[in-house]
């Protein structure tokens, strides 16, 4: 059986260990490649098994010494191997009885605290039934990282995973953001409630004012007396005893007011105009009026006017040749011109003078008739 032994690397030392059932260590984050080989007693000869571990050296951290742990039961032929996240396949060789396993060395934990997976989550069991010189190799897939969910302060359940960014700071910022969003709503709600209350008060005031106005108008209508006197006057003046419908007070006012007010106004105006004219006419007007006789046409007065003007003009010629002083001649000429102007005024006012003369004559006749009737 000496020819069946495998060559062992220089840096590895075989150790024989009796394995008991103990809890496994969590080495799921370690990048390792495991190669194990076991030999059993056959035909009374003892065969030793060697284990080799190869670890990649990460650049940012010092050289870690990751470990691999394998457990087997004495009576069973199963070997349980913890999967590693590396892409390097692990070769496993097993025999039937004794297994030699490398000691468990605590690996140095890397600085990547972003994700910490749960304990004993990605473990797999591999059954290997190897004969004397045969080995079974299995390619272990890379486990997917599990992210811890962000929990609020109120949750009291124990955390199996944690994230550095998912601590109380996130909870504080979460609460602060919610508080900041909720705070500006309160003044808006108060403002809206104030607006609604002010609108309700305004509508109530308007309704109360309108109702008060309506009540006042109704009271005034009830208090106002009905104009019964006007209806009685209209009924008494009529000779027929037929009942007449009572007219509304508005209609009676419209009919009566213009008659009472319109009648004295034009009379006063006419009297004022006549008085003003008499004052302006003066003495000359009274003289011209005295010259007119009623019933004489105006054509006669015009003919007389033309004749008088002609006489005055011809009378100036002998004055010019008589040799009188210039002072006298100018005086005579002024008299002639004055007479001519007065005659023209008289002719222009003839129709007016005739009308006034006729009115006076009629009024005189009326007075005389009234005196005779009284006598």
Swiss-Prot record:
Bilayer topology annotation: Multi-pass membrane protein
Q: Where in the cell is it found?
A: Membrane
The main place the protein resides is membrane
Q: Which domain of life is it from?
A: Eukaryota
Please give the InterPro entries that the UniProt record associates with this protein: Pkr1
Kindly list the GO CC terms recorded for this protein: endoplasmic reticulum membrane
Q: Where is the composition biased (Low complexity)?
A: 129-141, 198-212, 225-241
- In this chain, the stretch annotated as Disordered covers 1-76, 119-274, 355-375
Q: Where is the composition biased (Polar residues)?
A: 26-39
Any Gene Ontology biological process: vacuolar proton-transporting V-type ATPase complex assembly
Q: Which residues fall in a compositionally biased region of kind Basic and acidic residues?
A: 175-185, 256-274
Query: Which positions form S-S bridges?
Result: none
**Keywords for this protein:** Membrane, Transmembrane, Transmembrane helix
Biased amino acid composition, Basic residues:
1-12, 363-375
Q: From which source organism is this entry?
A: Dictyostelium discoideum (Social amoeba)
Instruction: Give TM segment ranges.
Output: 299-319, 327-347
Q: What is this protein called?
A: Uncharacterized transmembrane protein DDB_G0282483
